[in-house]
Amino acid sequence: IVNENNKIVFPLILKPISNGSSVGVSLIKTKKEFEEAIKKIEKISDYFIEPYIKGKEITVGLVRENNGIFTLPILGINTKNEIYDYDAKYTPGKTELEVPAKIDKKTEKKVIEVCSLAYEVLGCEGLCRIDAIIDENNKVYLMEVNTQGGMTNTSDIPAMAKSVNIEFED
């Protein structure tokens, strides 16, 4: 997020570390927005900053099985907002989810390899969800590992599971 001249490169993403469901996640485009957002977020949470990567947002559900790691179908996220933030997740009509994600087979294989490796390297156990972005060159960027992903009617893991006829009890 800082170039060779020690200048902040915009746009970037500001995320609180203490919230779920993308509460407080912001796309920052200018120095003024950055300064205002930092003042606001410092009062409620520690935070981290990452570069904004334009591309297709996806998420993958993974679980360890006896013979390795099982992956659910990749879920594609198409939002009308600039980023998949709280508003995009919970406002009807703002986001369309596609299962399986509309990506080519080569990219799908790469996503599964990268996410499975992250699951393994991080020592994940049980069910988790890994969020990523695929840029215009089909490069995969991992954004987040969710070891306690949502399990509501509108959550991602149940949508992925349902697409392969896996149902969860209430």
Language-model segments: residues:
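A short, polar/charged loop-to-alpha-helix boundary motif
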Residues: 83-84, 151-160
